[in-house]
């Protein structure tokens, strides 16, 4: 694995373990340092949480799922664009996730989120833009899903869930924000931009 991918995985694991420990020792209030709470940030509070939330996770399964995504798709993006651009997409997608969450949830004092999902979704979208033949394997779907179909379908579902204000413990706002920014930044950085993805849609649709 490339050093940058390994470094990001280790950073996520390290911060997540620190968050698990904080929760065990000090409870939910002590763990707020590891949470992005838009209502607090809007009032100039808990800026540390906004940063650490990018790398902290709610549990081992949450951490493992995100790191599996980063491991599976990060290598392809880094190989195609180089370390600097890979890290830029990862960071920009995380920031995009924060901006969408903040815009939609800053007035909700009960809203909290954490995890690298926004950044990881950005990397997944980058992999699909760079190579539209990429397939996405999901645990609850028996066959791999073509990357562009997943991209379009997940985007539509996320918008529906956000508009419906569904509260299911998943930050659909963050996922969508990370995916959109990851896609946009990749289009700007990739040598062929959107051309491979558009050709895929022309061929099959």
PLM features: residue spans?
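A detector for small-residue-rich transmembrane helices and their helix-helix packing motifs
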Residues: 1-205
